[in-house]
């Protein structure tokens, strides 16, 4: 997740474009094939995690622990991670040959691809086991803060019920929905059954200083490193850091940059709070020129980026035409979420975005590929929003109404509340609350909106997915691009594996 998986999730969506290898899956072109490394690496590493988790599940009881609760916590973590990687394989690649037991020989890696319903059941069973074994909030102390808790298992279980209810009626053979089950899992978290979670200052969810805060339910832990910045997914040191290549600011060099599509920028500009000011969440989501008249600043408010500088410090012309890559010029904003602003700059000249010397790779930060911002995969805000969605779609009302849960998220950002909500309200709010966090593509997938959304933007936005070139983006193809291709190595080594349609 520090490399291909997170960037692929973001850049496959309609939110942003990049010009790195990580962006290729989101270009939907002929270069996206089953041998491309950003397809192969997540697939292999996710299965590797499933194997390791299975070994722990089957062997941890053989180890003597002074504390039974600690043994249960470790076993619960293993169940959780095995569930999570299978869940992510299922929503990304669709065809999954689950690892139900620890492989003992090469033959054990040749497994039958099971029906999606069976895989969902396996994932949910693992999460139930995890939930019953894992500790509640507050158990982990010191260096262990941030490890998996029962609330994370409950939240992911609810998320699986919600995703299954959307995906399978559209792409599978079952029309059964699980909105009651989803709402019930989320409601237990809202009630405080696993400890108290709350909404914090929005910006705290995307920085280093406030990691593992009271809003964090499932947070992947990363550690910035200014010395060891080389990134090889699967190696010991690489797993410690978040690789920002493919999400960096315009001017950091082709292969590193990303831009935000105008529709997302415009959505935030149109979102005004109760005081008539620009939605505060915009300032933690993207880098943009906040001195434009259309941006309604609060007294003393300014957007700050790397080194504490402002947009005009990096881009004196007021837009991206200040830097060398002409393909960035038409866009209004760039990605901010995921960037570690605590990392030191190599020099104090913010206009020297592309290094301190000809031919160097010493961009904005000391090293751009070893950032330390944790990836908050499930926040309490997401639990509230998913609960509201499950209830709107027919799930049983728990301790809050759908509108009450929805309004809690809105109120945190000083936005107006609603007396009743619809799915359109939820879709709009998820854009503003969770932009560029890796959920948008899968939201569109489970709502059945992917193809229509991409076709609409292909017609209305001449710069949509054009950061690499005018021709790399070949258009979203329905009944193909919902899923990533199965890697060639899997097709060649597993007789039961078949390629996804269209590849």
Task: Show which residues each predicted segment covers.
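Long, intrinsically disordered, low-complexity segments
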Residues: 16, 46-49, 122, 144, ...
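Conserved, well-structured interaction surfaces
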Residues: 19-93, 109-121, 127-142, 340-345, ...
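Acidic, glycine-rich segments characteristic of secretory precursors and extracytoplasmic regions
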Residues: 1-11, 26, 33, 40, ...
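Flexible, polar/acidic helix-loop-strand segments at domain edges
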Residues: 24, 273-379
């Amino acid at each position: 997740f520090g490399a291909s998986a997170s960037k692929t999730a973001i850049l496959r969506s309609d939110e942003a474009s990049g010009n790195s290898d990580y962006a290729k899956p989101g270009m939907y072109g002929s270069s996206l094939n089953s041998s491309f490394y950003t397809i192969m690496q997540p697939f292999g590493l996710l299965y590797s995690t499933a194997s390791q988790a299975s070994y722990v599940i089957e062997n941890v009881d053989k180890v003597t622990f002074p504390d039974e609760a600690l043994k249960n916590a470790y076993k619960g973590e293993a169940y959780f991670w095995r569930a999570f990687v299978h869940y992510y394989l299922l929503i990304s690649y669709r065809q999954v040959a689950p690892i139900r037991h620890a492989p003992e020989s090469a033959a054990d890696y040749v497994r039958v691809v099971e029906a999606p319903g069976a895989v969902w059941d396996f994932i949910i069973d693992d999460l139930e086991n995890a939930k019953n074994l894992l500790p509640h909030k507050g158990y982990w102390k010191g260096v262990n803060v941030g490890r998996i808790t029962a609330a994370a298992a409950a939240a992911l279980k609810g998320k699986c019920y919600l995703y299954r209810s959307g995906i399978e009626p559209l792409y599978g053979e079952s029309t059964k929905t699980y909105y009651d089950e989803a709402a019930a899992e989320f409601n237990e978290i809202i009630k405080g059954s696993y400890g108290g979670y709350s909404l914090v200052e929005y910006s705290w969810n995307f920085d280093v200083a406030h990691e593992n805060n009271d809003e964090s339910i499932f947070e992947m832990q990363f550690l910035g490193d200014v010395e060891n910045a080389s990134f090889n997914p699967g190696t010991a040191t690489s797993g410690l850091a978040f690789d920002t290549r493919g999400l960096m600011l315009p001017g950091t060099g082709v292969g590193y940059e990303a831009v935000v599509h105008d529709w997302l920028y415009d959505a935030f500009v149109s979102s005004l709070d109760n005081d008539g000011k620009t939605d505060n969440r915009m300032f933690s989501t993207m880098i943009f020129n906040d001195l434009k008249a259309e941006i309604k600043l609060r007294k003393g408010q300014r957007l700050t980026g790397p080194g504490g500088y402002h947009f005009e410090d990096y881009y004196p012309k007021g837009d991206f035409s200040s830097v060398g890559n002409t393909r960035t010029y038409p866009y209004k904003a760039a990605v901010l979420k995921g960037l570690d602003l605590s990392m030191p700059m190599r020099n104090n000249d913010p206009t020297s975005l592309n290094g301190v010397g000809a031919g160097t790779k010493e961009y904005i930060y000391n090293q751009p590929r070893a950032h330390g911002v944790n990836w908050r995969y499930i926040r309490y805000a997401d639990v509230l929003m998913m609960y509201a969605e499950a209830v709107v779609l027919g799930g049983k009302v728990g301790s809050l109404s759908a509108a009450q849960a929805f309004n809690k998220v809105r109120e945190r950002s000083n936005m107006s509340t609603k007396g009743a909500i619809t799915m359109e309200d939820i879709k709009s709010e998820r854009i503003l609350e969770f932009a560029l966090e890796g959920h948008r593509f899968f939201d569109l997938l489970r709502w059945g909106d992917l193809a229509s959304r991409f076709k609409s933007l292909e017609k209305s936005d001449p710069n949509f997915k054009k950061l690499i070139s005018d021709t790399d983006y070949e258009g979203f193809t329905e009944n193909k691009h919902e899923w990533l291709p199965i890697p060639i190595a899997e097709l060649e080594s597993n007789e039961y594996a078949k390629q996804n349609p269209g590849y």
